[in-house]
Amino acid sequence: MYYSSGNYEAFARPKKPEGVDNKSAYIVGSGLAALSAACYLVRDGQMQGGHVHILEKGELPGGACDGYKFENLGYVMRGGREMDNHFEVMWDLFRSIPSIETEGVSVLDEYYWLNKEDPNYSLCRATEKRGQDAHTDGKFSISDKGAMEIMKLFFTPNEDLQDKKITDFFDDEVLSSNFWLYWRTMFAFENWHSALEMKLYIQRYIHHIGGLPDFTALRFTKYNQYESMILPMVKYLESHGVQFHYGVQVCNVEFDCTDPARKLAKRIDVLRGGEKDAIDLTENDLVFITNGGCVENSSMGSQNKPAAYNTELREGGGWDMWRKIAAQDPDFGHPDKFCHDPEKTNWMSATVETLDGRIIPYIKSICKRDPFTGHVVTGGIVTVKDSSWLMSWTINRQPQFRDQPKDHCLVWVYSLFTDKPGDFVKKPMRDCTGKEICMEWLYHIGVPENEIEDMAANSANTVPVMMPYIDAFFMPRAYGDRPKVVPEGSVNFDFLGQFAETPRDTIFTTEYSMRTGMEAVYTLLNVDRGVPEVWGSVYDVRDLLNATVKLRDGKKATDMDLSFGEKMVLKKALSKIDGTDVEKLLKQYGVI
């Protein structure tokens, strides 16, 4: 497997890998990484669909990419996905996945057209004082000292960031800025999370720094991600004869690692309908393992019931399976680095369905758009700056579900601090019913206090979800804590998803999951085509200059708070580039 960039590799079709007709694949889980691996096995690996087996413990595919209407409960979206125009693997695959809405059109086509015709941008990024614009006004509000803290992290070698926290590099100069308000709420970072991952994020999205305050950097699907992404992939795979095995729980994968140069997956231990079973493997049976799980132990509440906070990892779950696998070889990772402290990895979301028109005027007042036009509404999350829960909420294009009533609006609410009492509902979010969470949200969007309870009870249906391990992948880590996608010496197995190690890309993204699937297939089948490299904006001087200026709210280098000696050094340096292309470039991007 090798990385590539450019159209030469992107538009090429690989030859059929040698011996692929004699191989089979067993994929543990049916999340985005697993489905991507299956798609690449079929499209580029040219494996017969009937030889590809997806083992899913539940009744539906999709993993964390969900979006369902549950009978007697309501609509539930545990999370949402923010996409980037340089998710290179994602677009490489979706150009080949047919739309399930429009014949002759790919998922990429419909996504591209939608975001061209209805580009994303926010008209209100944050509120305070019960629905008033917080007037962050597109500013990062970072001091020169704060900018230097970010720069220090940016240039620190990855090896020196192992097991380091964000607070090891940032103090209040950054953590009290608009930059951190935008960043932590957009990506769900906490102060105690991995400094290494923070650096990777800054480098990965350096080309989008200017688009973070108003979300012009982002693109979204038409519907929820289950309907817009998962279902088209499933239909594509089914059309090629791929075998979906629901109700099959993988408990362990057994390996022979006696020869470090030839590590073999020998058996998959499963439960089928509660009965123990096993799948014996040969070298021609490839195993794709989704290890860990950010939505494991998730629980749903209801309008009148809180979501349970279940932190005990059960036998037979994704973490338990990874622990059993990791015990067999040190190269298979260290799961407990990520799942040992749910107080540092949990947050909650809630899906609010409006049932009449009473709440809509308050939404319009903040986002300055009508949510029923079918176009962009909030354009990304609106963060309640003075919320004790650090609440954010968003409304994507409506409807979010194909069967959603036309006069109902779906709002996604999430909060990072589930253990703090609310500002109106004096309880921690984790102890609140859906109705109570809706009341807290209504309070923060400016609904009169004497109307809040009635509106939450009769004008909305709210379903809360607690996810104890949703931020597990952000915990401080060292190299080796996550297994490589294909570990050294592997003959017939690999790891997929957010807890597999691949260089330069960032976790908690659709792209990361899909990239691990592509890399796994290309490595095990020796597919003779390049995997698109992570977009290289961090190596583009234009993007670096632009980001430097935008991060400092347009402040030029010559306007920095410098000592007399520093000013003299800068003046002398600028004199050396007078009349050169370097000077033109610095002026073009506002550095001088």
Predicted regions and their residues:
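Beta1-alpha1 glycine-rich phosphate/pyrophosphate-binding loop at the start
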Residues: 1-3, 37, 41, 45-85, ...
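C-terminal segments that line or cap access tunnels to active or ligand-binding sites in enzymes
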Residues: 206-221, 284-286, 291-516, 522-539
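Glycine- and aromatic-enriched mobile tails/lids
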Residues: 121-122, 483, 499-511, 523-592
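N-terminal glycine-rich phosphate/pyrophosphate-binding loop and immediately adjacent elements
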Residues: 13, 19-149
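Rossmann-like flavin
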Residues: 100-207, 218-220
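Helical element adjacent to the flavin cofactor pocket in flavoenzyme catalytic cores
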Residues: 203-286, 290-292, 304-305, 310-319
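Extreme N-terminal leader/targeting segments of oxidoreductases
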Residues: 1-25, 43-51, 69, 551-592
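Alpha-helix N-cap/helix-initiation motif
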Residues: 30, 79, 83, 222, ...
